[in-house]
Amino acid sequence: MISVFSVLLSFVGPAGIGQALAGDWIVGSISIRNDAGHKAYGERLSVFLVSDKIPVSAKKCLDETHHQRKVDCINNCHLDFYKRFQQKQMQTGYLIAQTVTSATGNFAFLDPPPGTHYVLVKFPALIDGYKVAWQEPVTVKPGRIGVVSLYDENLVLPKNRRH
């Protein structure tokens, strides 16, 4: 679990921590385990805060037994997720905020509106050569810091190694 204080400190610095704590925040971190089992951080990835969930499923890919067809299917799911995001972001009110992760995979959104939103990461995001995608709900309540951890277990699509 990430330290909320350390994430805020990395974004606003020691002088701005008092002011930062006065606002509403969503803070989070991104990491996966690579094939060797080592933690790899989502460095310099675009992260989006959006108002609505994009329908997506890779179930058909997981049932595929032929390796190359499975890889192709997962790649197509990542591309479809990207295209759906591109279409939805044109809708008024869909894209709430955008940020970029730090070198250690941390990110923050300052003063998001109250309510339930989704933290979204999509193609062309890569971590350690893996395509990754997330769409995780987060609820913003006034005076509370929302925390989101994006990792292997809550990927919206299977990670796929880029070859």
Model-derived segments and spans:
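Long luminal/extracellular ectodomains of secretory-pathway precursor proteins
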Residues: 16-163
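Bacterial N-terminal signal peptides
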Residues: 2-15
